Amino acid sequence: MSDNFKALVVNQEGDKFSREVKSVNKEFLKHGDVLVKVEYSGLNYKDALILKNGAKLVKEFPHIPGIDFSGTVVESKNENYKQGDEIICTGWRVGELYYGGYSQYAKVKGEFLVKRPKNLSAKQSMILGTAGLTAIQC
């Protein structure tokens, strides 16, 4: 992993809201015990609201949206995940309360992840996302 990578960062200072792709480093990622190289991230309705104006969904700025993502574990301090594990992250208020998947790398709590089934590609795993999984339950 290189020291710097790109992330879509939203920020709000007073009444001024901004969004831009920025170069950040691993230390910018605040939460979690598993570092993931993000391969795909879906566009969720909440992501669209956050990208529009923060939509009062984000409590702390700057912030990286992206409620759903899939990728490969790069580093882990969680006993359930090791380097090379292919994962999916959806829900748990990732992208709202925690930095999300609109970044080349994401750092999240291991309990937010599931191992991706081998018969499902990273891209396929993002087709449904949180919204699709919610609809299935209705």
Model-derived features with residue positions:
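Terminal peptide-recognition signature
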Residues: 7, 38, 135
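NAD(P)H dinucleotide-binding glycine-rich loop of Rossmann-like/cofactor-binding domains
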Residues: 90-138
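Cytochrome P450 core scaffold surrounding the K-helix E-X-X-R motif
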Residues: 46-51
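Short beta-strand or tight-loop elements
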Residues: 3, 20-22, 69
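Glycine-rich beta-strand-centered segment in the early N-terminal region that forms part
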Residues: 25-43, 54-94, 100, 112, ...
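Short gly/ser/thr-rich secondary-structure transition/capping motifs
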Residues: 15-21, 54-55
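Short structural boundary motif marking the start of a folded domain
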Residues: 2-8, 34
